[in-house]
UniProtKB/Swiss-Prot annotation:
Residues the record lists as Phosphothreonine modifications: 386
Subcellular localization, as worded in the UniProt entry: Cytoplasm
Keyword Hydrolase: no
Domain F-BAR, first and last residues per copy: 33-295
Gene giving rise to this polypeptide: RGD1
Protein name: RHO GTPase-activating protein RGD1
Induction notes from the record: Induced by stress including low pH, heat shock and oxidative shock. Basal and acid-stressed expression level is regulated by transcription factors MSN2 and MSN4 as well as the HOG pathway.
Length: 666
């Protein structure tokens, strides 16, 4: 498509005829008596010089506008032609028609940028022409002004000289009249001796004759210069100034018409680009081609494809069948307690996948309380998963067991301490042959997320109260709760994921200190009060800010940061690595060597912060802001400078960058 439209021939002819006719009609205006009177007066030159200066100022101002406009338009075109390509890139066949149509509609910005490029070129040419016109007219005005001032000065100087000769001549005549009235016999002493009155009269008459001659000559000279200036030079200068004024004004009128024509062409070509006259699809037709129902149908239908049938069933929702334990069939009411106990210090809480996204840790389930009669036994047999993400240098030596899953029957829920010890050994990342006994793999349920906890039955009986949550080491809290992530962390993450992801300034805005302190004290009195974190209905923004402040308070109150202080030297080495890939692999290794409590708690928090980042457009929390807030809380201080906050911020940035590589996906 052509970038510019041709000038309409009729418009050009009409403009030309109008201009010629207008010139013929207006030519007689300068022949009117009132205008002739002004042009023939002494004020004509100064008046026309002033008028020409106004035209030059108009030309200069229009030139500045054109320069600013083409600079602005050029920058706009450059940014527009580059930026629209960075959004809604279509890759693959999974994109919806909405995304494809947005991509097509934004493509019109590139086409309009091409159309505007010719407009910018025209503006640049106009600016060059107006600049040359201004420079030329300024020089001509200066030349005419200097010439007129010089001629006026010559006439003025001649008249002034004639006036001085006249004054000298009149003064001598007055002296001669006085001398005639004096005594004839009186003498006058001079440097040359005494002179009689007669001698004085003779000398004075000679001076009068000379002064009279000079006076007459200067009068004739001044009159001659004045007549020449008035009859010849001034009309020529006036005509020249008048021509310059009309010339610059006519040139500016033409430039103004060119500006309007190019602007009209820009608008017309832009309209043709958006709504083509041929069969090409317009911007509106692309926008109307969106099929939301078809997009949703295609998205849902892909779950029927081969290899995705397992996604249709949530293993967490498979009901548990009630089966009485064989040992309970002998009618013995008072049975001795088991001869073994689960030892948390021997890693009785196995590593497994957890999920805190869109799941409340306090959703009650009747099947969980009815299936297991003993809360202690239930909490001692969590599901097993060994998928703790390995760094690249170790991944090849350890086999994955993330898919080993099966429903755990009541008969297999009790494991002896020797068996537990053997499982612990097989889960050791340093073990060269990490194998889990086949009979145990078949009896473990590895797909059940641990984010579902009970508000009343998750704690051992008799120890619900007076167990502090804040200021307690993560290992002690995990051992007490018999879970992988502290309940307060899961509950706070659940609330913010559900209600606060789109809330502006989440984690940046703090809640009332008294409210945070009061809720903290209630939870320290009784861990069951964690349920108080759930906001009331309807909730306010302050309720969500309170949860965010409580979560920050929990991590800040830990005796040791989630990334232990012992790793501060290694973290410093990591941050000094320049290569991004090597730096991420190094941090991956540090994360892999973390204890289970720190590993899984850090994993839950990091994935939650990434979900907050995904809603940056709504909550205005970018990566830098989150790292400034969480870095000093999660990472240890610089071993060489405890006041170096940037060390902790940079460590948090690397941690978020390596999260997908270092942690199991949710």
């Amino acid at each position: 498509m052509e970038e510019t439209a041709k000038k309409p021939a009729s418009a050009t002819v009409s403009a030309k005829s109008s201009h010629d006719g207008g010139t013929d009609d207006l030519a007689h205006l300068f022949s009117t008596p009132e205008i002739k009177k002004v042009l023939n007066s002494d004020v004509a030159i100064n008046a026309l010089l002033s008028r020409l200066k106004q035209s030059l100022l108009t030309c200069e101002e229009f030139m500045k506008f054109i320069r600013k406009k083409y600079a602005f338009e050029e920058e706009h075109v450059q940014e527009l032609s580059k930026q629209y390509k960075h959004f809604f890139n279509i890759q693959g066949s999974t994109n919806s028609s909405l995304k494809k149509m947005i991509h097509e509609v934004l493509g019109f910005d590139g086409k309009m940028a091409q159309v505007k490029q010719s407009y910018i070129t025209a503006l640049q040419k106009m600016y060059s022409e107006i600049s040359s016109l201004l420079l030329t007219m300024t020089k001509l005005r200066k030349s005419v002004k200097e010439n007129s001032k010089r001629l006026e000065k010559d006439v003025s100087d001649a008249i002034h000289s004639a006036e001085k000769a006249q004054s000298r001549y009149n003064s001598l005549c007055q002296d001669w009249d006085k001398l005639r009235m004096t005594d004839p016999t009186k003498t006058k002493l001079t440097l040359r001796g005494s002179k009689t009155t007669k001698e004085q009269e003779e000398e004075l008459l000679r001076k009068i004759d000379n002064a009279d001659l000079e006076y007459k000559q200067k009068v004739d000279h001044s009159n001659s210069l004045r007549n020449t200036f008035i009859t010849k030079e001034r009309p020529r200068i006036v005509q020249e100034l008048k021509d310059l004024i009309l010339e610059i004004d006519t040139a500016m009128t033409i430039q103004l018409q060119k500006y309007t024509i190019w602007t009209e062409n820009l608008v017309l070509n832009t309209g043709v680009t958006i709504s083509p006259l041929d069969s090409t699809k317009s911007m509106k037709s692309f926008a109307g081609s969106v099929s939301n129902e078809r997009d949703l149908y295609s998205f849902l239908n892909k779950y029927n494809q081969t290899g995705k049938h397992s996604l249709l069933i949530n293993k967490n929702l498979i009901p548990v069948s009630y089966k009485k334990h064989p040992s309970m069939n002998h009618g013995q009411k008072n049975k001795s307690p088991p001869k073994f106990a689960v030892d948390p210090s021997r890693n009785s809480i196995p590593k497994r996948m957890i999920s805190t996204h869109n799941e409340s840790p306090f959703l009650s389930s009747s099947s969980n309380t009815a299936a297991v009669p003993n809360a202690n036994l239930n909490s001692a047999t969590p599901s097993l998963n060994t998928n703790k993400q390995l760094p690249p240098t170790m991944a090849s030596s350890i086999s994955s067991t993330s898919n080993a899953a099966g429903a755990m029957s009541p008969s297999s829920s009790i494991v002896t301490s020797d068996t537990t010890s053997s499982i612990t050994k097989t889960l050791d990342p340093g073990n060269n042959s990490p194998q889990i006994p086949e009979e145990l793999i078949n009896s473990l349920d590895s797909d059940r997320p641990i984010s579902h906890i009970q508000t009343n039955n998750n704690m051992p009986p008799g120890v619900q109260k007076n167990f502090k949550t804040f200021g307690v080491p993560l290992e002690s809290l995990i051992e007490f709760e018999q879970d992988m992530v502290p309940a307060i962390v899961r509950q706070c993450i659940y609330v913010i994921d559900k209600f606060g992801l789109d809330q502006e300034g989440i984690y940046r805005k703090s809640a009332n200190v008294l409210d945070v302190s009061k809720l903290k004290e209630e939870i320290d009195k009784d861990p069951a009060n964690i349920s108080m974190i759930l906001p009331s209905k309807p909730h306010s923004d302050s309720d969500i800010y309170l949860v965010g402040s409580l979560l920050k308070t929990f991590f800040a109150s830990l005796p040791d940061s989630v990334l232990p202080k012992a790793l501060s030297s290694e973290i410093k080495v990591c941050l000094q690595i320049e290569d991004p890939t090597t730096r991420k692999n190094f941090m991956h290794g540090l994360i892999y060597n973390l204890p289970d409590a720190q590993y899984w708690t850090l994993r839950a928090l990091v994935f939650h912060l990434k979900r907050v980042l995904a809603h940056e457009a709504q909550n205005r929390m970018n990566l830098r802001a989150l790292c400034i807030i969480w870095g000093p809380t999660i990472a240890p201080a610089n071993p060489d400078d405890a006041n170096d906050v940037n060390f902790q911020i940079m460590a948090m940035e690397v941690l978020l960058e390596v999260s997908d590589q270092a942690f199991e996906p949710e």
